[in-house]
Amino acid sequence: MLQPSNRKYRKDFKGRNRGVASRGNRVSFGEFGLKATECARITARQLEAARRTIARHIKRGGKITIRIFPDKPITKKPLEVRQGKGKGSVEYWVALVQPGRMIFEIEGVDEALAREAFSRAAAKLPLKCLFVKRTVM
């Protein structure tokens, strides 16, 4: 699973996930992409499950690029522990995703296969996604 190797501080503030993606919103590395259409927190486990689904569907065909990274720690206190006594320990890692953000990209496969692979991967993610093609400018 993806997580940062080292950080200056172990725990983050809760924060808010608002706005639209101004960066990482175009297909850059592949021919087809899976684009987010709403805000969400995607966990490292969800990302890995979606990646495995894509890899299993396209077999040895193409190259998968993951465009997001789970770099935000989410903390949790143990069950049946009273409030107070400091912040809980890091439970898992998430990537904050805004609408328009590219999540995965594929190259080296035909469109029908890529569309089906992304459709299966989108079912593993907690947000609505859109299949997009690279536009040449």
Swiss-Prot record:
Keywords: Ribonucleoprotein, Ribosomal protein, RNA-binding, rRNA-binding, tRNA-binding. One of its GO terms (biological process) is translation. SUPFAM superfamilies: Ribosomal protein L16p/L10e. One of its GO terms (molecular function) is rRNA binding. Disulfide bonds: none annotated. Residues 1-20 are annotated as: Disordered. It holds the Pfam family Ribosomal_L16. Binds 23S rRNA and is also seen to make contacts with the A and possibly P site tRNAs. Belongs to the universal ribosomal protein uL16 family. PANTHER family: 50S/60S RIBOSOMAL PROTEIN L16, LARGE RIBOSOMAL SUBUNIT PROTEIN UL16M. This is Large ribosomal subunit protein uL16. It comes from Coxiella burnetii (strain RSA 493 / Nine Mile phase I). The gene is rplP.
